[in-house]
Amino acid sequence: MSSSIVLSNNNSNSNSMSMIGQSPPCCSDVPNTPASEEMTRMVKNVVASWEWVPLGKDKVGIIIPADQDHRQVHKSRFVDLLEFCDETMKVKEVIAVFGRADLTVAAGFPRTLRYVGFRVVAPENFPPTLDATTHFAMTYVV
């Protein structure tokens, strides 16, 4: 079962597009650089089903299935991914994005992320391309 993350365009026609397997509207103008290819490789090395997307100049979103089992996450590669985001991608914030708004940090993978230092993103602080009514997000400030 695959989950789908929908990002909204902030243009007048309110189109939205599934993130999984397609280029999102927010990064259609991002060049295919060695750094972005390496980012994709590093994300997939943590968990093969994960995706990533730029969420502005200094933020990236890691798209994680809502039912992610923490035992399937390669922990040292996850730490390597966070270091890569800081040192190579030069981002200031990594946002874990889940395709369900009803998740909490009380259980599941969000609970694990809390112990690593991720904090819940309040709906009013979501990046403009994420819909707070259909997503749960946690942020890690690099």
Swiss-Prot record:
Read off the Gene3D superfamilies from this record: 3.40.630.60
Query: Which PANTHER family does UniProt cross-reference here?
Result: ORNITHINE DECARBOXYLASE ANTIZYME
Q: Name one GO cellular component term.
A: cytoplasm
Q: How does it assemble?
A: Interacts with ODC1 and thereby sterically blocks ODC homodimerization.
InterPro entries referenced in this protein's UniProt entry, alphabetically: Acyl_CoA_acyltransferase, ODC_AZ, ODC_AZ_sf
Stretches the record annotates as Disordered: 1-34
Q: Which species is the source of this protein?
A: Pristionchus pacificus
Which SUPFAM superfamilies does the record match to this protein?
Answer: Acyl-CoA N-acyltransferases (Nat) (SSF55729)
Protein's name in the database: Ornithine decarboxylase antizyme
Bias (Low complexity) occurs at 1-19
Single annotated GO MF: ornithine decarboxylase inhibitor activity
Q: Which family does it belong to?
A: Belongs to the ODC antizyme family.
- Show the taxonomic lineage: Eukaryota, Metazoa, Ecdysozoa, Nematoda, Chromadorea
Q: Which GO terms describe its biological process?
A: positive regulation of protein catabolic process; viral translational frameshifting
Role noted for this protein:
Ornithine decarboxylase (ODC) antizyme protein that negatively regulates ODC activity and intracellular polyamine biosynthesis and uptake in response to increased intracellular polyamine levels. Binds to ODC monomers, inhibiting the assembly of the functional ODC homodimer, and targets the monomers for ubiquitin-independent proteolytic destruction by the 26S proteasome.
